Amino acid sequence: MYSACAVALRAGARRVVRRVPKSARALPRAAAARRQISTTAARSTDLTTRGMIVQTLSSVGSKREVQQYLSLFTSVSSQRFAVIKVGGAILTDYLDELCAALKFLYTVGLYPVIVHGAGPQLNRLLEDAGVEPQFEEGIRVTDAKTLRVARDLFLQENLKLVNKLEEMGVHAQPLTTGMFRADYLNKEKWGLVGKVTGVNKQAIETAISNGYLPILTSMAETDDGQILNVNADVAAAELARALEPLKVVYLSEKGGLFDAGGQKISAINLDEEYEHLMSQAWVKYGTRLKIKEIKELLDTLPRTTSVAIIHPEELQKELFTDSGAGTLIRRGSKLQASTSLSEFKDLEALKSVLIRDREGPDAKETVEKYLDFLKENPFKAYFDSSMNALAIVLPASEGRQATLATLTITKSGWLTNIADNIFTALKKEHPSLVWTVKEDDENLGWFFDKADGSITRQGDVMFWYGIENGDEIVKLMKDFTENGRAMLGNSNLESRLRQAASKPAAQQVRGYSTLARRPALPKFSISNRRGYLTQTNPNPPVGKQNASMDRPARVALIGARGYTGQELIRLIDSHPNMELHHVSSRELAGKKLEGYNKQEVIYENLSPEDVRDMEKRGEIDCWVMALPNGVCKPFVEAVWEGRKASGHKSVIIDLSADYRFDNKWTYGLPELVQRSNIIQATQIANPGCYATAAQLGISPLVPHLGGMPHVFGVSGYSGAGTKPSPKNDVENLTNNIIPYSLTGHIHEREVSSQLGAEIAFMPHVAVWFRGIHHTISIPLNKSMTSRDIRQLYQDRYAGEKLVKVVGEAPSVKNIGGKHGVEIGGFEVDKSGRRVVICATIDNLLKGAATQCLQNMNLALGYAEYEGIPTM
C-alpha cells in the first residue's frame, strides 16, 4: 500500500533521513563536489581514512546509520553542516571529549562552526580580582574592567581549544575579531553588551574552504570598533540565522532537557507541543527560557533545521544515529484535515501527491478513478501544508473497520516528523483502524510499533490497532487470508494500482502475528530500539506485538538458592506482569524470601507430588527449574502428569542442561531460534551461559566457515555455583586461572549441535565474580575484511536489544550487571581467511536469569523485553 519511502526513523518521536542505497554506501569523492564552496587539496578526505572513521563511528550505531547521516550532512555546503555552541564549563571539564568528537567530524570531512563562551571562568577571575559579577535579567552587566578581563580570557580559551585540536591533527583557525557586528543592547542597563546585527560569513567560508575548523568567540564589535560582550547562546543563534545549518548543537553538561519525572526528553516537536509544554508547571526557569529561545530561533530557520542539546561525550551518537542521545528540538508540522475533495485548493496537486512514488503505466488513470470514488464516499484526509505527507482514512461502517486507505510521505515529511503526527491524529479520532503495507516496505518496523496485531499474506502485511473483540480479529484475519488487499475493495489505492499494473497472482498464506497467546509470527526484519526497518535480521524481535496476556503470570521457582535463582527473583520483582507464588529450596524452607517486595513469600520444600497437584489445579502459569544438572526430571514429569489430568498447560523453563539436546523441547535462544517457536512452546530449555555468548559470536559466520572455530572462554567464579570447590575458591583463584574440561565440555556439544558446525571449546575460571569473556578464532572459507565481517554482524543482529556489536574487543568489567552480549574485536589476519572475535556476557543475567525472563515473556504472551533493562 505504501510508497517506498526509503528512510530511517528516529526513535519514538524522531524520524530521520532516507536510508542509503547499497550503491551509495561508499560515499565517493564526488560527494565533495556537491558542496557549494570550493575545496582544496588540504581538506580533501582520504577515503581509506574516512572508511576507518565510519567503522569507528559504527560503535555508536550501525554502519548504515553513520553513512546515511554523512550523506545528508555532505549534501549541503560545508558551513551549513552545523553550528556548535560550547559553554565555558565544557572547555574546562570536557576538553578532551570535545576535541575527540570534533576530530571525528573533521576526519570524515565535516566542518562544524564552533562558537564558545567562558562564563564560569570569567566569574572566577572577576571574584579573584574582587569584582562581584552583576546580572540583570540573566544578562551579564559588562563594564570596561569586566570586558578587559573577558577579552583576555576568551582569547586564552580560544587558543587553548585551537592548540588542543592542532595537537590531535585537526587544523583549526581562531576567529576572534571581526566576526560579529553589533550595536549596544542597552548601554545604560547592561553597559558593554552587544546585540548582534551581522555575521562575517566570508571569513567562516574561507577558513573551511582552506581545511580549517573555524573557532569563534562570542565577542562582537560596533562599526566604530568598540568591542562588546555577547552571550554565547545568542552568538550561536545569530550564527545559525546567518548560515542556516542542518544542526544547531548546544553542548551541555546535563546532556539534554528533563521532564517532571527527571527523565530526559528525547524530542520536542514545537508546532504540535509548544503550547502544551509551556502550560506545564514543571517547565520553568532555565528550561522554559531555553525552549522559548529555541522556538524563536527555529521560527527563523528552514524547517529542516533542528536543535540538539547534548553532552560532548555523546556528540557522535546524536549526529550519527537514529536514536540520538540528548534532546532534539524541531519545528515539526501542524496537520490539516479535509472531508471533501472540494476542500482541497488544488486538485492537480492532490493527484500529483497520490501518484508520487507509485509505479505502473496506468497509475495516472487509476488515481483519477480513485478521486471519483472519494467524491461518492465519506473519507477524511490528513496532510501538512506542503503535502509532504498525506493519509486518507475511510470511516468505519456496518461490518467494516475504519481503514487507512492510503499513506504517502516524502523524505522531507519523514525529516520533519509528520508520520508520527499523523498517527497521533489517527489514534485520537479513530479508536480502531486497519491498514496494509508491502512486506518489503522499509518502514515496516515503524508500522509494527503503531499496531496491536498483524497478519502476513504473500508480500503484504495487514495491521490493526484497537480491535478488542476476538471474533472480529478472527474474521478480519480470515478475510485477509482468503482475499489479501482485495478485501478492502475499491477503498485501497495500492490495491487498485496493483490490479491496473498486472494480473492478479495466486497468493499463498504465510505466518501471522495476532494478539492470541502464542501466535505464529511473520518473518519480518525490524531494527533496534528506534523503530526502523533494516531488512537484514531474519528473526527480528517481536517487541510489544507479542503482548497478549491480560493478567499477571503466576510463577513457581524450583531451586531458588543459587546465584541464578536470586537474579531471577530480582527480575520478577521488578516485572510489571509477573508474580512469584512459590519458591522451593530444601535448605531455605520456612525462611522468608528476601529481595522480593510484591508480597511476602516463604521458601517451601516442594515435592514432585506437590508440583503435580498444583498443575492439576491450574495454579501456576510458569514453572522455572533452577536446579543442578540431572535433578529436575521428577519435577518436570510431575508437571506432565498434572497436565494429563487437567488439560492445563503451563510453561516449563529448565535452566539446567538436561533438555538442551531433546528435540521435544524448544531451545530458548531468541536471537537465533525462531521466536515464533518459543512463543508457541510449553517447555523451553534455557541455553548455557558460555553457549549463549559463543553461539552469538559465531553464528553469522557459519556459512563462511573454513574450519573448526576455537573458543577460549574465561568465566568468573560465580559460574561454578555456590557449592564450595576449587573453581570458586577465591584464595585458590587469586593470581591464577584454572582450565577445566578442555575437551568434550557439555557447552562444546551444545554449541556444535545448535550451530550445525563443530567447535572446540576450552573453558577457564578466573578470580572475578561474574562475567564471561570468549576469544573466538574462526577460520574462513574465503578472504574477508574486518569491515565486511563487522557489517555482517551488525546486519544479523539489527534490532536486537540484548546484543551489542562494538568496534573494540569488549571487556568483562564492562559487562557485569548488563543484560546482553557484547561482540567486538573483528581482527582479521593478513591472509583474510581467519578472524578473531571477542564476546562478553554476564553469566548470571543474559547467560541465565535474563535469558529465562526473555523466554518467559515470549511464551507467556508479554512484550519480549518487558522487565529487562536493554543494552
Swiss-Prot record:
PANTHER family: N-ACETYLGLUTAMATE SYNTHASE (PTHR23342), N-ACETYLGLUTAMATE SYNTHASE, MITOCHONDRIAL (PTHR23342:SF0). GO terms for biological process: arginine biosynthetic process via ornithine; L-arginine biosynthetic process; regulation of DNA-templated transcription. SUPFAM superfamilies: Carbamate kinase-like, Glyceraldehyde-3-phosphate dehydrogenase-like, C-terminal domain, NAD(P)-binding Rossmann-fold domains. Residues 1-44 form a transit peptide. Residues 336-488 form the N-acetyltransferase domain. One of its GO terms (cellular component) is mitochondrial matrix. This is Protein arg-6, mitochondrial. Pfam families: AA_kinase, NAT, Semialdhyde_dh, Semialdhyde_dhC_1. It comes from Neurospora crassa (strain ATCC 24698 / 74-OR23-1A / CBS 708.71 / DSM 1257 / FGSC 987). One of its GO terms (molecular function) is NADP+ binding. Keywords: Amino-acid biosynthesis, Arginine biosynthesis, ATP-binding, Kinase, Mitochondrion, Multifunctional enzyme, NADP, Nucleotide-binding, Oxidoreductase, Transferase, Transit peptide. It comes from the Eukaryota. Gene3D superfamilies: 3.40.630.30, Acetylglutamate kinase-like, Dihydrodipicolinate Reductase, domain 2, NAD(P)-binding Rossmann-like Domain. HAMAP family: ArgC_type1.
